[in-house]
C-alpha cells in the first residue's frame, strides 16, 4: 500500500514537472515569485531574527520593565479585541437579523473610522474627553484623565470595531436561512435558536474578526503613543529603543517578541477553523425564504445600541472637521482657513502618501491575482509554501515588517533606506495577503472548465490568464485596489521606521504634529487625507 502511494506521488510530481517544462512562461513566473519571496520576505525576516544576540534576549527576558510592557501589550490587546468583537457582532446582527430603521445610515457611519488613521480616534478622544476636553472640561467641568489603559481601550475599541463588523457581517449575510427556519419549525426559538444555530454558523466570522482585531491592536502604534501615557506597550517601546535609546538590537528583540502573540493567534485561528466544519450543504436556496429576525424588544435594544455607537463615531469625525476649521477649538470658534493654508504648505506629504498608496495598491492587486492564479489553478512543487509565504505578513505587526526592511536594505546592492521604494515595499508586504485572499475568493467562484477549454484550444497559461481570468475578476480587482489604497493611506506602524525627511507621509506627519501640539494642522491633514479615501 505504501509503495503504491509513493508511486502515485512520484508520478504526480513527475507530471507536474513535465507541465512546467512544457510551459516556460509558467515556470519562469513560479521561479520569479519564489525569488521575490526569498529576497523581500524570507531574507528581511531572517535578518531581524539574527540581529539580537543571546545577551539581548536575556536582557529583555530578565528585565522587569520588559515583563511589564509585555503584560500591558497582551492585556490591552485582549480587552480591546473582546469589546470590538462584541460591538461588531451586535452591530452586524442588528443590520442582518432585524427590521430596524436607519440601516443604511448605520452601515455608512460604521465604515467612517476606516477612512482615517487609527490614531485619529485617540486624538478625537483627547479633544472631547481629555483633561481640557470639550465635553469633560468645557461642558461638565470635570477633571478626567484619559491617558492610560482606559483611554487606550476605548480608542482601540472604536478604531478597530469596523474591522470586526465588516468581517462578521459578511459571514452572517452568507448564512442560508434554511437551517434557521428548519430549527424554528422543530421548536427552537429565541435565545436557544440564536445560540445553537446562528452563533455556531457565525463562528468563522468571529474567529476571523478576532484575528484581524487582535493583530491590529497588538501592532497599533499611534493610539498607545498618544493616549497610552505611561502605559507602555511593545510597539511603542520598540520604536523608543531604536529612535530614542539608539539600541537597535533591543528594538529588534522587542519586535520579535511582538510577533509571538500574533503568530499564536494566527495559527490557533487557522487550526480551529480547519478542525471544525461550518459548511452547510443545502443545494440551491428555496426562493421566497425570509430570514428569521429578532423580536421587537431585541430589535429596539439593537437599534439603540447602533445609534449610540454611530453617534460616538460621528462625534469623532465631527471634532476632526470642527478643529480644522476653528481658530482654537474649545475657546475660540471663529471660522478660519489658516490651518488649511499650513496644510497646503505641507502638501508634499499628502502627495507622497498618494503616490506610495497608489503604487502599493497596484502592486498588491497585480501580484495578488498572479499568486492566486498560480496557487489555485496550477499544480507545482512548493505550491503550499507559496501560499504560506503570501499569507505570512498578515500575522506580523507593522513595526516588525518596517524594522526588518530597514535592517535588510540598509546597505549593499539593494540599499533603499530613505527612499520611496522602501516605503512602497513595506506597505506592499503588509497589504499583499488581503489582495491575495480577495483574488483567491474571486477565482473560486469561476468555473475552472472555462480555463480548461482555453487550454484545449491551444492557449498557454499566460494567454488564458490574460484573456479569460482577468476580465472575469474585474470586481475583485477593483475591491482589492481600493482597500489597499485606503489602508496604505492610513498606515502608521509599518512605515514609522521607513520614512525620512525627504519622503515623509501624511499619517506620520499627523502623529508628529499631534505630539508637538499642532493639532489643528494635523486635523486638517486628516480631513485632506479622508478626501482622497472618499473619492
Question: Residue spans of the language-model regions?
Answer:
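Short, Lys/Arg-rich, polar N-terminal cytosolic tail immediately upstream
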Residues: 1-22
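The alpha-helix within a helix-turn-helix
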Residues: 183-184, 454
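Membrane-water interface segments at the C-terminal ends of transmembrane alpha-helices
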Residues: 21-55, 64-173, 199-222, 253-270, ...
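Peri-membrane helix termini and adjoining interfacial loops of integral membrane proteins
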Residues: 7-10, 48-59, 128-140, 227-235, ...
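Alpha-helical transmembrane segments of integral membrane proteins
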Residues: 267-304
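Helix-loop-helix hairpin linking two adjacent transmembrane segments in secondary transporters
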Residues: 236-261
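A short amphipathic helical element positioned immediately N-terminal to and/or at the very start
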Residues: 14-20, 55-62, 335-344
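Glycine-rich helix-loop "coupling/hinge" segments at transmembrane-helix boundaries
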Residues: 221-245, 332-333, 492-519
Amino acid at each position: 500500500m505504501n509503495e503504491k502511494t509513493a508511486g502515485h506521488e512520484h508520478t504526480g510530481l513527475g507530471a507536474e514537472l513535465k507541465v512546467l517544462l512544457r510551459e516556460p512562461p509558467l515556470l519562469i513566473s513560479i521561479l520569479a515569485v519564489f525569488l521575490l519571496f526569498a529576497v523581500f520576505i524570507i531574507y528581511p525576516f531572517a535578518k531581524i531574527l539574527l540581529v539580537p544576540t543571546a545577551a539581548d534576549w536575556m536582557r529583555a527576558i530578565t528585565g522587569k520593565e520588559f515583563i511589564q510592557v509585555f503584560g500591558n501589550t497582551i492585556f490591552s490587546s485582549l480587552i480591546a479585541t473582546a469589546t470590538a468583537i462584541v460591538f461588531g457582532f451586535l452591530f452586524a446582527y442588528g443590520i442582518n437579523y432585524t427590521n430596524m430603521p436607519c440601516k443604511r445610515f448605520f452601515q455608512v457611519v460604521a465604515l467612517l473610522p476606516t477612512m482615517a488613521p487609527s490614531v485619529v480616534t485617540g486624538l478625537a478622544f483627547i479633544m472631547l474627553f481629555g483633561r481640557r476636553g470639550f465635553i469633560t472640561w468645557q461642558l461638565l467641568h470635570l477633571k478626567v484623565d484619559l491617558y492610560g489603559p482606559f483611554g487606550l481601550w476605548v480608542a482601540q475599541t472604536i478604531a478597530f470595531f469596523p474591522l470586526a463588523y465588516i468581517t462578521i457581517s459578511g459571514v452572517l449575510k452568507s448564512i442560508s436561512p434554511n437551517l434557521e427556519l428548519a430549527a424554528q419549525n422543530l421548536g427552537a426559538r429565541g435565545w436557544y435558536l440564536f445560540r445553537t444555530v446562528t452563533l455556531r454558523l457565525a463562528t468563522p466570522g468571529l474567529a476571523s474578526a478576532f484575528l484581524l482585531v487582535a493583530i491590529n491592536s497588538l501592532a497599533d502604534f499611534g493610539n498607545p503613543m498618544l493616549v497610552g501615557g505611561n502605559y507602555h506597550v511593545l510597539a511603542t517601546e520598540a520604536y523608543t529603543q531604536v529612535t530614542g535609546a539608539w539600541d537597535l538590537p533591543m528594538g529588534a528583540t522587542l519586535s520579535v517578541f511582538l510577533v509571538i502573540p500574533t503568530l499564536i493567534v494566527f495559527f490557533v485561528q487557522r487550526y480551529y477553523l480547519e478542525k471544525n466544519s461550518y459548511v452547510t450543504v443545502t443545494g440551491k436556496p428555496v426562493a421566497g425564504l425570509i430570514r428569521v429576525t429578532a423580536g421587537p424588544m431585541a430589535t429596539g435594544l439593537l437599534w439603540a445600541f447602533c445609534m449610540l455607537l454611530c453617534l460616538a463615531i460621528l462625534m469623532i469625525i465631527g471634532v476632526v472637521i470642527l478643529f480644522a476649521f476653528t481658530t482654537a477649538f474649545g475657546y475660540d470658534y471663529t471660522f478660519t482657513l489658516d490651518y488649511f493654508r499650513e496644510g497646503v504648505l505641507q502638501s508634499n506629504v499628502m502627495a507622497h502618501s498618494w503616490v506610495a498608496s497608489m503604487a502599493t495598491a497596484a502592486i498588491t492587486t497585480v501580484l495578488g491575482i498572479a499568486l492566486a492564479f498560480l496557487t489555485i489553478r496550477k499544480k507545482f512543487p512548493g505550491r503550499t509554501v507559496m501560499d504560506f509565504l503570501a499569507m505570512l505578513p498578515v500575522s506580523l505587526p507593522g513595526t516588525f515588517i518596517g524594522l526588518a526592511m530597514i535592517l535588510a536594505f540598509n546597505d549593499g546592492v539593494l540599499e533603499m533606506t530613505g527612499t520611496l521604494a522602501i516605503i512602497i515595499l513595506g506597505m506592499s508586504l503588509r497589504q499583499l495577503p488581503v489582495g491575495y485572499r480577495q483574488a483567491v475568493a474571486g477565482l473560486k467562484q469561476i468555473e475552472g472548465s472555462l480555463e480548461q477549454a482555453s487550454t484545449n484550444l491551444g492557449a498557454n497559461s499566460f494567454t488564458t490568464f490574460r484573456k479569460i481570468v482577468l476580465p472575469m475578476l474585474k470586481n475583485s480587482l477593483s475591491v482589492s485596489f481600493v482597500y489597499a489604497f485606503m489602508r496604505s493611506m492610513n498606515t502608521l506602524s509599518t512605515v514609522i521606521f521607513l520614512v525620512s525627511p525627504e519622503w515623509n507621509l501624511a499619517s506620520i506627519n499627523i502623529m508628529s504634529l499631534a505630539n508637538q501640539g499642532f493639532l489643528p494642522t494635523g486635523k486638517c491633514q486628516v480631513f485632506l487625507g479622508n478626501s482622497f479615501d472618499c473619492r
